[in-house]
Amino acid sequence: MRATPSSSPQPFKGLVVIELGHSVAAPFAGHILSELGAEVIKIEKSDGDDARRWGPPFWEGASAFFQALNRNKSSVVCNFRDPHESQALQRLILERADVVLQNLRPGHVEKLGLDGPTLLAQKPSLVYCNLGAFGRTGPLKDRPGYDPLMQAFGGVMSTTGEPGRPSVRVGASIVDMGTGLWSVVGILTALYERVQTGRGRVVDVSLFETATSWTSLLAAQYLCTGESPQKQGSGASGIAPYKAYITLDGEVVVAAGSDSLFRSLAQVVGHPEWIDDPRFVDNPSRVRNQVELYRMLDDLMAQRATRDWVNDLEAAGIPCSPVQSIAQMAEHPQTQALGLIQPVPDTGMRFVSLPLSLDGQRPVSQGRPPTLGEHTDSIDRKSTRLNSSHIPLSRMPS
């Protein structure tokens, strides 16, 4: 059954998250928590999160990037340079927050008195998550960073692309989004512990640490042999045949990663003699002779259409897939059957939902992305009711 905003699972309902976040990593973490029911209050500088301007394309007043990451959040504007407003923000955190997320530039929250140790000293139950660039310690801890820099520094780019050609960034922001995901893992760990102890924690994650985690299997090869893995194109180090091929009308990926699957592949491509060929008799042999094996498979695959290959390979039980565009993925019946792309209430927007379901229901957005400072006044008034010595946060110009 498809979930609607009223029936969508909201296991984090009642959890209040203050997001001092910009760009991708912290907003993606806030997005996950928001889609699962948390109230996420996004604190923005006076001209807003820079991601609002990351376009084109723009959709209903902000970039598609921003809208995808910030739906169902409140937006509050704060002039961090004004000490009165920083104090008001601190009070908002102490009064309402269960969780604080922050990925501001290194040292900024400490100057504002909004760092984890300062806030936990006043509110021990708070869970505070730092999303940094290089990590909480070490010679580079104070440097800023972004996804492509960390794909480069963390070794991801060095193993991505075709052999003999320049390194390539993975198209998706895997380091930014992975860091957001790891921050949620850390936050949930701390919240689970808080149920038992009543105390929060400071959680530290970073883009660099996330990048190293994505390369952990490749790093295992280096740690075992002392040799850095090389680029494999669409293939995988240590497994053959296991890559994409150009067909008559597109591309197809074939993953014949075991001896039995290779025997089946040899039959499908019309070369049963490969089964007993000493060069290809087992995976280590195929890896040693993969240049010749791939040359022959490349020639064969180019002779037929993608759909013909997929039909024959699937009939033989060989894992394979056409290389789909984003448009093909979005419109595929499997995507639609899973309800992976959902409309956003009160907008014409559609976005990819969280890749999980609870009791068969996928969490869906409860509200649209906020305009800049849209909720400053309403949250300001709520804080005023809580504290008679309230100093207001910024007002948006009319």
List each language-model region with its residue ranges.
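A glycine-rich dinucleotide-binding beta-alpha-beta segment and adjacent secondary-structure elements
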Residues: 315-366
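Flexible, small-/acidic-enriched active-site or ligand-binding loops
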Residues: 2-3, 281, 345-385
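Glycine-rich beta-alpha junction loops
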Residues: 47, 134-135, 207-212, 249-251, ...
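Single conserved hydrophobic/aromatic residue that forms the stacking wall/gate
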Residues: 382, 386-398
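N-terminal helix-loop segment corresponding to the beta1-alpha1 unit
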Residues: 1-196, 371, 375-385
